[in-house]
């Protein structure tokens, strides 16, 4: 997998990182953002990728490389009725990549709006985004269980908001919590791994060590 050098999808489009990358599947941003790019940029991307706005079995089957760019409504917050975009797209990516590779594949899935919701100190959105991300994790674990040779790693690059759980009532099903910050914090984040070589990811680790270990495993 090539590393795309920017977090901004618009910048990725402008530099034409996508056509020159080794990516087989991507889904990000929205089709509206794609349409705002210069015609020559759109043309170059479409030369390499089949671009779809909605899941299309016929187009997916015919494609050699796929870009799924849904409408803005599907990438909004779960509080804005996004639906099951993240878990369903995770399943789409797993199905697409596993059917086209005899030597395995690397897939990264990000629940980006967990961070955004924490920056806003929005309790409800954080909880709902985490539960939505958990469904994407479930899709990955189910595939790994069936495949038997897939490693799944779940973590975060940082904590946001310093969310503290203060008190709760099991009978009422309620929990009191408070945010201490609206920014990133040095609080440690969980690291979970399931599958072959998962023991490499136990204990307390520097996050840069996680990526180095992934690269070492991919090189084997």
Enumerate the language-model features and the residues they cover.
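Solvent-exposed loop/turn segments at secondary-structure junctions
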Residues: 1, 31-35, 58, 73-76, ...
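Single conserved hydrophobic/aromatic residue that forms the stacking wall/gate
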Residues: 2-13
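Loop/turn elements at helix/coil->beta-strand transitions in domains of secreted/extracellular proteins
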Residues: 21-25, 47-50, 64-66, 99-106, ...
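Structural recognition of the beta-strand scaffold that forms the well-ordered cores
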Residues: 24-29, 67-70, 105-110, 115, ...
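Long, well-ordered, tryptophan-enriched scaffold segments
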Residues: 26-75
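Active-site His/acidic residue clusters
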Residues: 72-77, 90-94, 101-104, 108-136
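Metal-dependent active-site segment of extracytoplasmic phospho-/sulfohydrolases and closely related
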Residues: 131-170
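Substrate-binding rim/cap in mid-to-C-terminal beta-strand-loop elements of soluble/periplasmic
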Residues: 180-207, 211
């Amino acid at each position: 997998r090539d590393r795309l050098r920017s977090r901004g999808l618009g910048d990725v489009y402008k530099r034409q990182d996508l056509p020159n990358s080794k990516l087989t599947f991507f889904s990000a941003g929205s089709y509206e953002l794609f349409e705002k790019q210069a015609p020559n940029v759109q043309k170059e991307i479409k030369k390499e990728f089949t671009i779809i706005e909605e899941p299309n079995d016929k187009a997916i089957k015919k494609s050699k490389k796929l870009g799924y760019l849904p409408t803005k409504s599907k990438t909004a917050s779960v509080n804005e009725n996004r639906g099951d975009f993240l878990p369903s797209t995770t399943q789409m990516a797993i199905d697409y990549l596993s059917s086209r590779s005899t030597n395995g594949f690397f897939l990264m899935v990000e629940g980006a709006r967990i961070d955004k919701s924490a920056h806003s100190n929005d309790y409800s959105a954080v909880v709902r985004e985490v539960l939505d991300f958990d469904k994407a994790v479930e899709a990955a674990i189910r595939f790994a269980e069936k495949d038997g040779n897939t490693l799944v790693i779940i973590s975060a690059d940082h904590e946001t908001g310093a969310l503290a759980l203060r008190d709760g009532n099991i009978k009422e099903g309620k929990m009191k919590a408070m945010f201490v910050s609206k920014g990133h914090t040095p609080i440690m984040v969980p690291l979970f791994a399931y599958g072959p070589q998962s023991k490499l990811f136990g204990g307390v680790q520097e996050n840069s060590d996680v990526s180095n270990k992934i690269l070492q495993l991919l090189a084997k």
